[in-house]
UniProtKB/Swiss-Prot annotation:
It comes from the Eukaryota. Keywords: Acetylcholine receptor inhibiting toxin, Disulfide bond, Ion channel impairing toxin, Neurotoxin, Postsynaptic neurotoxin, Secreted, Signal, Toxin. GO terms for molecular function: acetylcholine receptor inhibitor activity; ion channel regulator activity; toxin activity. The record marks Y67 as: Important residue for interaction with muscle alpha-1-beta-1-delta-epsilon (CHRNA1-CHRNB1-CHRND-CHRNE) and neuronal alpha-3-beta-2/CHRNA3-CHRNB2 nAChR. This is Short neurotoxin SNTX14. Residues 1-21 form the signal peptide. The record marks F48 as: Key residue for inhibition of muscle alpha-1-beta-1-delta-epsilon (CHRNA1-CHRNB1-CHRND-CHRNE) and important residue for inhibition of neuronal alpha-3-beta-2/CHRNA3-CHRNB2 nAChR. InterPro entries: Snake_3FTx, Snake_toxin-like_sf, Toxin_cobra-type. The record marks H28, R43, H51, R66 as: Important residue for inhibition of muscle alpha-1-beta-1-delta-epsilon (CHRNA1-CHRNB1-CHRND-CHRNE) and neuronal alpha-3-beta-2/CHRNA3-CHRNB2 nAChR. It comes from Ophiophagus hannah (King cobra).
Length: 78
């Protein structure tokens, strides 16, 4: 019985994802961030006049633009 429990414990530890990664919304679905990407962003930018573009996803640092949202919890940039 002890051997079975020990085996189960070892298999569980090996199968677990020991590192935490942030999950952010993209325009279509979710994105799992790289370990160094600590923030989710949602920002609107204009590449051309009167044509706003929405950008969403993981980022290394928070954008400082006027129409931007930056947060650091899972799925916070909806």
């Amino acid at each position: 019985m002890k051997t079975l429990l020990l085996t189960f414990l070892v298999v569980t530890i090996v199968c677990l994802d020991l590192g935490y990664t942030l999950i952010c919304h993209q325009l279509h679905g979710l994105q799992t961030c790289e370990p160094a990407q600590k923030f989710c962003q949602k920002r609107t930018t204009m590449f051309f006049p009167n044509h706003p573009v929405l950008l969403m996803g993981c980022t290394y640092n928070c954008p400082t633009e006027r129409y931007s949202v930056c947060c650091s919890t899972d799925k916070c940039n909806k």
